[in-house]
Design a protein with these regions (language model features):
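Short S/T/G/P-rich N-terminal loop/turn motif that feeds into the first structured element of a domain
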Residues: 1-50, 59-62, 85
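A structural signal for short, well-ordered beta-strand segments
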Residues: 5-7, 54, 79
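Short, solvent-exposed amphipathic alpha-helical segments in soluble enzyme
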Residues: 22, 70-71
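Short, electropositive alpha-helical surface patch
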Residues: 55-68
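A common structural junction motif
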Residues: 71-78
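A short, structured active-site edge motif that brings together acidic residues
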Residues: 78-85
Length: 85
């Protein structure tokens, strides 16, 4: 299944200038994605809007939810199943 995941945060929690938090976010998600059989197809960022978008392939919604678990403290997440056209 394909999923469109949107992550948002605000200026106060932005990781752009906090290298330790940025590494925790990126490494935490990458490791959890691999552990839960979630493949990162694409990643897009809009720095001005404090938004990151992922296209993921996963067996089910639960796998995506588990992959996001280590980074939930960094903001809000919207998980939406999608299909290719």
């Amino acid at each position: 299944m394909l999923f469109h995941v949107t992550h948002t945060h605000d200026y106060q929690t932005c990781m752009a200038h906090r290298e330790e938090a940025r590494n925790e976010f990126n490494d935490g998600f990458t490791k959890a994605a691999t552990a839960n059989n979630v493949q990162i197809i694409a990643t897009y960022n809009n720095r001005g809007r404090h938004t990151r978008i992922w296209i993921l392939e996963a067996p089910d919604y639960h796998a995506v939810d588990k992959a996001l678990e280590p980074i939930l403290k960094f903001g809000n997440y919207d998980i939406m199943p999608v299909s290719a056209m």
